[in-house]
């Protein structure tokens, strides 16, 4: 919205600063951060008054029993902060802004309904797996179709392979839709599985969003894209605004979500943030880079799939408990040790992902 002020720069020279992506990206991050910090205490009080307390698994680590009753659904604060900040600082004429907000809020609505059933109706299972998959699939397919249309118009219907500048595989409509669907739905569920310890998913989301913001900035400028051998995606520079808003909102939320957490994000936050990250990766054609940067999310999801699949086949477990962060807790790691060490791993993975900008 503030971008419109740049049109009045003829009357007031200083207003032309609003046309610069870097300025608006920084302001989007600060706005979302301030929003989360300002409304965080109110959100916690409101969730507590509504008795939206998290029910902790009795078969999980015994140290988690003290978390029982901690307010959940705090992800609604994150989504509101991202939406408000993006609308204030983003370009409303850019279709990617609306696709990202649509995916964020649609998957957030699913997570909200799931959380609401768990905490208000005391339904430990929440919505059925079938209902959740249908909802996620519908959102992902609609977003994928919209992105395919935009990608087809800009000749960016390709698959980029990191570290190899000569490999850019044409996907076609089926390949594009399948890859986009798997990226969006897969990342959504992977982040949700990661969100099991205080701050464990929140900071990695910040790191991955920041990394993808750099790719979006480079891809949205033809000269940078050409120099770095990236696909030029017209309008991708506005995706930076969304990514930095996500960073700011999550950092503000982390203030209250850090150990010992005063509030959990719940499915409303985790499902939405994961889907948004996946959508950003599809827009900038960096699905493989997302796998690298979000390696923590990948490992968490794979650990669950391996555990479930192996147990069904052999009645034995590979890990002491899945997702894998609980495995290390059972091995004696303190919760804060698991969280910080997984953060460090994510920092390294994001740096490796960024190195693909030059190592080709």
Curated annotation (Swiss-Prot):
The record's top EC class is transferase
Give an example GO biological process: regulation of cell shape
**Named cofactor requirement(s):** Mg(2+)
**Which compartments does it reside in?**
Cell inner membrane
Give any Gene Ontology cellular component.
Answer: plasma membrane
Classify the protein's membrane topology as the record does: Multi-pass membrane protein
For this protein, the record's PROSITE patterns field holds: MRAY_1, MRAY_2
Q: Which UniProt keywords apply?
A: Cell cycle, Cell division, Cell inner membrane, Cell membrane, Cell shape, Cell wall biogenesis/degradation, Magnesium, Membrane, Metal-binding, Peptidoglycan synthesis, Transferase, Transmembrane, Transmembrane helix
Please list the reactions this protein catalyses.
UDP-N-acetyl-alpha-D-muramoyl-L-alanyl-gamma-D-glutamyl-meso-2,6-diaminopimeloyl-D-alanyl-D-alanine + di-trans,octa-cis-undecaprenyl phosphate = di-trans,octa-cis-undecaprenyl diphospho-N-acetyl-alpha-D-muramoyl-L-alanyl-D-glutamyl-meso-2,6-diaminopimeloyl-D-alanyl-D-alanine + UMP
Q: Which GO terms describe its molecular function?
A: metal ion binding; phospho-N-acetylmuramoyl-pentapeptide-transferase activity; UDP-N-acetylmuramoyl-L-alanyl-D-glutamyl-meso-2,6-diaminopimelyl-D-alanyl-D-alanine:undecaprenyl-phosphate transferase activity
Q: What is its EC number?
A: 2.7.8.13
Transmembrane regions: 24-44, 69-89, 92-112, 133-153, 158-178, 199-219, 239-259, 263-283, 288-308, 337-357
Pathway, per record: Cell wall biogenesis; peptidoglycan biosynthesis
Does the record's keyword annotation contain Transmembrane? Answer: yes
Q: Which InterPro entries match?
A: Glycosyl_transferase_4, PNAcMuramoyl-5peptid_Trfase, PNAcMuramoyl-5peptid_Trfase_CS
Q: What does the UniProt record say this protein does?
A: Catalyzes the initial step of the lipid cycle reactions in the biosynthesis of the cell wall peptidoglycan: transfers peptidoglycan precursor phospho-MurNAc-pentapeptide from UDP-MurNAc-pentapeptide onto the lipid carrier undecaprenyl phosphate, yielding undecaprenyl-pyrophosphoryl-MurNAc-pentapeptide, known as lipid I.
The entry's family comment says: Belongs to the glycosyltransferase 4 family. MraY subfamily.
**Protein name in the entry:** Phospho-N-acetylmuramoyl-pentapeptide-transferase
* Organism expressing this protein natively: Neisseria meningitidis serogroup B (strain ATCC BAA-335 / MC58)
Biological classification of the source: Bacteria, Pseudomonadati, Pseudomonadota, Betaproteobacteria, Neisseriales
């Amino acid at each position: 919205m503030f971008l419109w002020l740049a049109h009045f720069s003829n009357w007031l020279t200083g207003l032309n600063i609003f046309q610069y992506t870097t300025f608006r990206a920084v302001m989007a991050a600060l706005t979302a951060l301030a929003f989360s910090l300002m409304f965080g205490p109110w959100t916690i009080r409101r969730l507590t008054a509504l008795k939206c307390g998290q029910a902790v698994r009795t078969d999980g680590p015994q140290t988690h029993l003290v978390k029982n009753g901690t307010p959940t659904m705090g992800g609604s604060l994150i989504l509101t902060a991202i939406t408000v900040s993006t609308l204030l600082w983003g370009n409303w004429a850019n279709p990617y802004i609306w696709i990202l907000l649509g995916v964020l809020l649609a998957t957030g609505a699913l997570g909200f309904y799931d959380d609401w059933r768990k905490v208000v109706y005391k339904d430990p299972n929440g919505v059925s797996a079938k209902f959740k998959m249908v909802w996620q699939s519908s959102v992902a397919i609609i977003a994928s179709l919209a992105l395919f249309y935009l990608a087809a118009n800009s000749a960016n219907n390709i698959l980029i392979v990191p570290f190899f500048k000569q490999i850019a595989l044409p996907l076609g409509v089926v390949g594009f839709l399948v890859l986009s669907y798997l990226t969006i739905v897969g990342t959504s569920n992977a982040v949700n599985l990661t969100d099991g310890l205080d701050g464990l998913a929140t900071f990695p989301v910040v790191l991955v969003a920041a990394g993808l913001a750099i790719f979006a900035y480079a891809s949205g400028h033809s000269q940078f894209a050409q120099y770095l051998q990236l696909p030029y995606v017209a309008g991708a520079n506005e995706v930076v605004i969304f990514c930095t808003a996500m960073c700011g909102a999550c950092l503000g939320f982390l203030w209250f979500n850090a150990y010992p957490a005063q509030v959990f994000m719940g499915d409303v936050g985790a499902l939405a943030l994961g889907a948004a990250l996946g959508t950003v990766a599809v827009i900038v054609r960096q699905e493989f880079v997302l796998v690298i940067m979000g390696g923590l999310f990948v490992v968490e999801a794979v650990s669950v799939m391996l555990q479930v699949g192996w147990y069904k086949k052999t009645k034995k477990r590979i890990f002491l408990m899945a997702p894998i962060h609980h495995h290390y807790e059972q091995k004696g790691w303190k919760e804060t040790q698991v969280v910080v060490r997984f953060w460090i791993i994510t920092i390294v993975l994001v740096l490796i992902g960024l190195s693909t900008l030059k190592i080709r």
